[in-house]
């Protein structure tokens, strides 16, 4: 396990909308380089960079046509190497986005695979053995695409043909389903290793793996896919022990034993995560909602078994959002609401991820036309709001030439305005990041224990502990004040306020009463008894 993950706080950068350095309306790598100072100011120490490879951009770069070259709209391989080098000098590590399971239909490998004549790439993708065979359990196919007599299996959109990592349980009725140890699946695995090695040698610190559980087909329990990643992890541990990999699998109990250092909790596959910030209001409220109708047990009853089963093997990552999650965290929330959400995100175990702009409370824009396969996700991908200059400081291009429009309301949050405000959300998030990194009890692998977490009640109180240091975190997202008795956890001396609400503890008999105003919380160091 790379030691640096213990103190890691990640920041997700969507390159096309972060900062445009050349005025063409699209963000780029030199633009990110110019903004490294901001990341250092914020206090994050790691970056997840969304796909930046050559692509026709039908799915915003998740349709790769060359895994070894940076897309010209973002810059060059030399630009990316410069970014790696300069970031590392500033204490920042960069993880690339690895689309391991499929390519674009524009990839030269796939174009060769489409040919009716047998060649080196014929079996690098999954094809049925007749154009008239278009269905098989567990896969979807695109029919009649090529002169080759067969239909190809796709992972998501029709232009994302699945690479052939084999089938865990090939169906004898479908001889085109190759076992995982067949020559072509083994060749594809070797190519994946080559891609990983290429970018690690250039300076990447690891990878976020897109659709990590999708590689081996007809693998219902994920065992063969897990075996593949375990082999990669063993190789990384030997040759690149400081490299980290995180999976988009949303199944920590599968992904972490499979070799990933981290696995995301995500709305799809994790109702508990959804209950924190984005539970549909027509059924019930999220926990972080001032109405006070949320329930922390909806999260904890799912999270705790996952945490207990994986805590000695890897980390669960709880993100503030990402490019696929709508709406943004800032939608419908005040700065106080958001501060409390970040108090939670930055004091929980595992590795936190901040989606660009969430630290200033950026909002999704409704009603945007889909861009590069974004569809309903497009509004959560708009340009970073740097200042009050045209285009929010994102680009000098004419507004109608921007990759996506910026929010133009007078009250839009910006980095410049919040840097100038000592009590701004941005500076609160900075304080919380610094708090996390200054206290071993708040590191990724330090112990976690709920102290008060009753269904439908407030506050939510938990302990983090490492060695002699114990920190109590209390959260009241409801607009009404709350009070709870805390017995047995404290000494006779009141806890030290590290962050947030002061004067929260009152001595009551042999115990303590914890009182929190509405929409408030704090982190408190406990003294030894």
Functional labels for PLM-detected ranges:
Residues 2-190, 201, 212-259, 384, ...:
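Acidic/aromatic-lined carbohydrate-recognition and catalytic surfaces
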Residues 5-6, 239, 259, 298, ...:
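Loop/helix patches that line or flank the sugar-binding groove of alpha-linked glycan CAZymes
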Residues 16-18, 53-55, 100-101, 205, ...:
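Short, solvent-exposed loop/turn segments at secondary-structure junctions
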Residues 105-139, 229, 233-383, 388:
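Conserved alpha/beta catalytic core and glycan-binding cleft of carbohydrate-active enzymes
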Residues 196-218, 318-322:
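Active-site groove signature of glycoside hydrolases
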Residues 481-501:
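Beta-strand-rich binding/interaction modules
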Residues 496-512:
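Solvent-exposed beta-strand/loop surfaces of large extracellular or lumenal domains
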Residues 508-529:
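C-terminal beta-strand-rich structural cap/linker in extracellular carbohydrate-active enzymes
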């Amino acid at each position: 396990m790379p030691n640096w993950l213990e103190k890691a706080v990640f920041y997700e950068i969507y390159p096309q909308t972060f900062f445009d350095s050349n005025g063409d309306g699209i963000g780029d790598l030199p633009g990110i380089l110019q903004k490294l100072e901001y990341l250092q100011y914020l206090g994050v120490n790691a970056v997840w960079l969304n796909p930046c490879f050559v692509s026709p951009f039908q799915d915003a770069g998740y349709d790769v046509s060359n895994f070894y070259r940076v897309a010209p709209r973002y810059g060059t391989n030399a630009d990316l190497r410069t970014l790696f080098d300069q970031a590392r000098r500033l204490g920042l590590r960069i993880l690339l986005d690895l689309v391991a399971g499929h390519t674009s239909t524009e990839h030269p490998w796939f174009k060769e695979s489409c040919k009716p004549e047998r060649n080196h790439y014929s079996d690098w993708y999954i094809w049925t053995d007749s154009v008239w065979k278009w269905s098989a359990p567990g896969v979807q196919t695109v029919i009649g695409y090529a002169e080759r007599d067969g239909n190809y299996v796709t992972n998501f959109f029709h232009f994302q043909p699945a690479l052939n990592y084999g089938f865990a349980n090939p169906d004898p009725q479908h001889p085109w389903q190759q076992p995982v140890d067949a020559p072509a699946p083994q060749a594809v695995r070797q190519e994946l290793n080559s891609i990983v090695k290429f970018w690690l040698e250039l300076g990447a610190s690891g990878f976020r793996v897109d659709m990590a559980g999708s590689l081996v087909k007809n693998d219902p329990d994920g065992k063969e896919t897990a075996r593949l990643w375990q082999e990669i992890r063993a190789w990384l541990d030997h040759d690149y022990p400081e490299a980290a990999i995180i999976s988009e699998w949303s199944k920590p109990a599968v992904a972490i034993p499979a070799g990933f250092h981290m696995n995301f909790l995500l709305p799809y596959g994790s109702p508990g995560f959804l209950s924190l910030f984005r539970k549909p209001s027509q059924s019930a409220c999220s926990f972080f909602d001032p109405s006070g109708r949320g329930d922390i047990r909806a999260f904890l009853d799912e999270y705790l078994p996952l945490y207990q089963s994986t805590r000695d093997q890897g980390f669960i990552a709880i993100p503030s959002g990402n490019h696929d999650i709508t709406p943004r965290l800032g939608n419908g929330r005040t700065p106080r609401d958001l501060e409390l959400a970040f108090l939670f995100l930055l004091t929980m175990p595992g590795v936190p991820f901040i989606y660009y702009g969430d630290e200033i409370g950026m909002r999704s824009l409704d009603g945007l036309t889909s861009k590069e396969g974004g569809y309903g996700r497009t509004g959560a991908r708009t340009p970073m709001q740097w200042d009050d200059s045209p285009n929010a400081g994102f680009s000098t291009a004419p507004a109608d030439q921007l990759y996506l429009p910026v929010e133009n309301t007078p009250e839009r949050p910006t980095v410049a305005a919040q840097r100038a405000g000592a009590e701004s959300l941005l500076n609160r998030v900075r304080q919380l990041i610094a708090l996390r990194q200054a206290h071993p009890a708040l590191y990724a692998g330090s112990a976690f224990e709920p102290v008060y977490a009753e269904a439908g009640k407030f506050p939510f109180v938990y302990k983090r502990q490492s060695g002699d240091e114990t920190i109590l975190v209390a959260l009241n997202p409801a607009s009404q004040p709350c009070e709870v008795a805390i017995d047995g956890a404290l000494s006779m001396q009141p806890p030290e306020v590290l962050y947030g609400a002061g004067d929260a503890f009152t001595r009551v008999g042999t115990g303590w009463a914890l009182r929190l105003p509405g929409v408030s919380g704090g982190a408190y160091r406990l003294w030894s008894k």
